[in-house]
Amino acid sequence: MSLADFDQLMMRRALDLARLGTGYARPNPLVGCVITHEGRIIGEGWHRQYGGPHAEVNAVAAVTEQHLLPRSRAYVTLEPCSHFGKTPPCADLLIDKGVAEVVVCNLDPNPLVAGRGLQKLRDAGIQVETGVLEAAGRWLNRRFFTVQEKQRPYVVLKWAETADGYLAGPYFQTVPISGELARVAVHQWRTEEQAI
């Protein structure tokens, strides 16, 4: 397997991990991290809940053989943060642990980060690669990107009406209109969205 194929495989795993934060990490983005050493996963994590440790912190903590970190490669779905917020900067953690390479899916559009995390890594001598599965990462965090880039919420509109154009039953009685699949989809959206 080529390095490019391996990078995509590991980033897919990181994206899968990031999805586990759905409904818990908001309003923060969904972030996953996989750490490898010589082609083997040695640690992985995701941002489990708002205010809690970020994906990189959880992935580093999961590494049982910490001595391997200086020769490791970290795959992160979003640029490691570079500022103090509810948690310390993840870029600093990766630098302190001596991670050799960092592969990033998307740059963080948040003005507090916006390239500063990657610059910190590069200034520390860490090799950085960006844009691996970038479109998949943007789709996963479309809500976060919309808020950061457009300063507005991500909007989902669900519309259902009867065959004759009504939105409810007679006398505004609640009746199912769109069926079971739509009901399941709406409940999924309610888990993912920040407002209804």
Spans of features found by a protein language model:
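Short beta-strand segments
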Residues: 32-36, 76-77, 105, 158-160
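Glycine/alanine-rich phosphate-binding loops at beta-alpha junctions
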Residues: 2-70, 78
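Zinc-dependent deaminase
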Residues: 1-22, 41, 66, 85-196
